[in-house]
Amino acid sequence: ANDMVLDDAGLMFPDDNHPGVDLILPDYSYVLEHADKLRGIVITHGHEDHTGSLPYLLKDLDRKVPIYATKLTLGLIEGKLKEHKIKNAKLCEIKPGQSIKLGCITAEFFSVNHSIPGAVGVFFRTPAGNVLHTGDFKLDQSPIDGVRTDFAALSRFSEEGVDSVSYTHLRAHE
């Protein structure tokens, strides 16, 4: 299949070993070389390490690619794009429990609890197999915003079959 989805578009902030460096951006050369296959960009939540490189990537892409995220995350992305003078980005709101078709790839979103509201994980169904990306999450049974990680969805994905899991737990202590 000739379809590709980018899952998060973050950046890193340098540590003391990188004096004079403001930001560390990912190498998007593969994405740019195969941009015609890029069906969408999925963003799991609004933190910089998941959204920070979006303006730089969008400036380098030769076409508008839809960006999928929850309402709060899209609001944060809009502000970031405005700072970089990027107009008319194709922003698409998703909700937990929703599935979208991106070429031959289906992305199903599920709630996760994190230190920022509006966080989701994504279950990708592809011709090559199923990939579960949890996004950043923490195990908190009494979250401030009342949104818990959707363990029923995780169980359902497990029964369906998961070929690869990608997870992070940054800021889990917050």
Regions found by a protein language model. Give the residues of each.
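His/Asp/Glu-rich metal-coordinating catalytic cores
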Residues: A1-V42, H47-R171
